[in-house]
């Protein structure tokens, strides 16, 4: 466990206790998978202090944790998250924009990663989740992504349909071990899959796991940094040779 992780865990407990002792809602910054994993390790130390994790939309990977609840405090405070719609001025002449393109352009403005949530892209339009106190600056400062001129505005509603799209995928494996599933879905060898676990790049429901033989539970989200994420839907049948047909929802 690194010193930075220990400091982060102490910070979580400080924020939780501040909420409890002062009777107010307290928010973290946006948390990535590694930070969420650190939070999962101190949940038992919260002594029943309520919390909620939310990233601006159902299915968001990067989330803010809010300590406190309406039931306990008697009032409600929404998450301080703004949604920025970023679209090319002209789709006809726009580059094909990726998550990396959007993130790089925003970070080049001098913005801290901790103030940014997910960036979802639909039909070459980016939906950027950001802290309220930085959103207006992004809107006024981000004029170009890659070589494409952009038009930005803060929106109150997300596009209809699923912002985070998944596709059903079936893989065949000898068992439900998580390392085998990761290897099959991302087209790599078991050895390469095992390396990802050793590097602490695999997370189950936001908690890091190095256990290559872990059997996922139905509904758990498996995230692999640098590769993608999926929802485990279980084994629904067997092949004639006895292999399992495993179904997953893979984020696309």
Task: State the predicted function of each range.
Residues 1-179, 185, 208, 221, ...:
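Ferredoxin-like alpha/beta domains used as RNA- or RNAP-binding modules
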Residues 175-226:
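Basic (Lys/Arg-enriched) interaction patch that binds polyanionic ligands
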């Amino acid at each position: 466990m690194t010193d930075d992780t220990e400091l982060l865990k102490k910070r979580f407990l400080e924020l939780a206790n501040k909420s409890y002792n002062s009777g107010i809602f307290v928010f973290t910054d946006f948390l990535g998978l590694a930070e969420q994993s650190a939070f999962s390790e101190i949940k038992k130390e919260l002594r029943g202090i309520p919390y909620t994790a939310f990233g601006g939309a159902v299915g968001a990977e990067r989330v803010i944790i809010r300590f406190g609840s309406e039931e306990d405090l008697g009032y409600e405070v929404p998450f301080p998250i703004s949604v920025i719609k970023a679209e090319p001025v002209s789709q006809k002449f726009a580059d094909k924009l990726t998550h990396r393109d959007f993130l790089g352009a925003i970070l080049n403005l001098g913005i801290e990663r901790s103030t940014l949530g997910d960036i979802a892209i639909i039909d070459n339009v980016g939906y950027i989740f950001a802290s309220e106190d930085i959103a207006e600056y992004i809107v006024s400062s981000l004029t170009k992504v890659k070589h494409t001129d952009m038009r930005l505005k803060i929106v109150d509603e997300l596009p209809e349909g699923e912002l985070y799209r998944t596709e059903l995928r079936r893989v065949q494996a000898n068992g439900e071990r998580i390392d085998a599933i990761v290897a099959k879905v991302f087209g790599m060898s078991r050895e390469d899959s095992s390396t990802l676990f050793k590097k602490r790049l695999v997370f189950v429901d936001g908690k890091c796991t190095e256990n290559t033989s872990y059997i996922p539970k139905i509904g758990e989200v498996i995230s692999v940094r640098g590769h993608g994420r999926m929802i485990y839907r279980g084994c629904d049948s067997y092949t004639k040779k006895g292999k399992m047909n495993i179904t997953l929802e893979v984020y696309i």
